[in-house]
Amino acid sequence: MLDNTLENISKLNESDFIDSLINEARLVTIFLVSGIKLEGIITSFDTSTVTLRGSNNTQLIYKHAISTILPV
């Protein structure tokens, strides 16, 4: 039961963090678990994906592939 509570808190923190990045239109660097580095502005997200608008394209990234989101 405790694990469920911690998981819910973690998801709320994740949502709040990504929401703030979207609302501020912050430039971010996203590192994937494969080591690939992506830069852009997060425009939307749901439970399993993040949409990143880069300089010349928009990418749909699955959250399980994300290692780190770093505001620039």
Please give the residue ranges for each predicted region.
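Short glycine-rich, low-complexity segments
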Residues: 1-39, 43, 47-72
